[in-house]
């Protein structure tokens, strides 16, 4: 009888130990794969961000006349790449005609809350409600000089995702034009820019910092927003006027095709 009880106890003990081991292995397995998935997703976004930096550099080379065309490969996995509707940006000054560009943004959207955008020469990453400018546009604001090189990317309404693993962003330089070249201390320089509401604060911060670097006596801001201009999800920011010793504005049109 004692042997039977001992045998039963051993079986029960084995079952309990086996169940504990199985539960532990299952938890470690699930946690491990969740961690691997998170690591994979983070690395995918980081790779996309690096690809956008390459794209911005390629566009900058075309903007400076260093290349007639460029192609940039971006890996998608479960993400989607689109070109947005065109949004307007202008630079005005006393005694000059209004100058600007109507440019489409290139946007990478993950399955989560992160997106990366190339817009007017800048690369902006947005995580949920937090946006940061990873790469600044090819503008110069310093020591009284303001040089704005508009990269006017064209080709709105395109989108690739789903089963596509990679996208090739083909860009070809179209036309270039010097819009303003004023070295006679232009005054009342004003910047107006349409952007997605999620990126408005980033652009406000950028322009405020840059204008202050060009004109140390400027005490204005760029927080004058108008959400009734430019359509859905678009807001227009406006900077208070400022002066400079020199203002130069150019525009290069670049045709964008996603394949």
Q: Predicted segment positions?
A:
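Short N-terminal edge-element motif at the start of the domain
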Residues: 43-107
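Hydrophobic alpha-helical segments
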Residues: 1-71
């Amino acid at each position: 009888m004692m042997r039977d009880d001992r045998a039963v106890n051993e079986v029960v003990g084995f079952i309990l130990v086996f169940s504990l081991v199985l539960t532990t292995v299952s938890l470690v397995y699930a946690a491990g794969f969740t961690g691997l998935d998170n690591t994979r997703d983070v690395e995918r976004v980081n790779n996309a961000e690096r690809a956008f930096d390459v794209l911005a550099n390629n566009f900058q080379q075309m903007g400076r006349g260093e290349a007639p065309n460029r192609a940039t490969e971006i890996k998608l996995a479960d993400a989607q790449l689109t070109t947005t509707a065109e949004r307007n940006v202008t630079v005005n000054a006393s005694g000059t005609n209004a100058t600007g560009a109507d440019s489409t943004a290139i946007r990478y959207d993950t399955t989560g809350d992160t997106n990366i955008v190339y817009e007017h020469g800048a690369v902006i990453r947005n995580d949920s409600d937090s946006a940061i400018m990873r790469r600044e546009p090819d503008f110069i604001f310093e020591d009284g000089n303001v040089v704005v090189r508009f990269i006017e990317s064209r080709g709105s309404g395109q989108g690739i995702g789903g089963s596509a693993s990679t996208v090739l962003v083909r860009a070809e330089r179209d036309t270039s034009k010097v819009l303003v070249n004023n070295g006679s201390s232009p005054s009342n320089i004003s910047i107006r820019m349409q952007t997605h509401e999620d990126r408005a604060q980033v652009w406000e911060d950028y322009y405020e910092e840059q204008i202050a670097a060009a004109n140390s006596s400027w005490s204005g801001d760029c927080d004058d927003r108008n959400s009734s201009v430019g359509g859905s999800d678009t807001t227009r920011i406006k900077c208070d006027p400022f002066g400079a010793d020199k203002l130069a504005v150019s525009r290069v049109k670049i045709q964008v095709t996603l394949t």
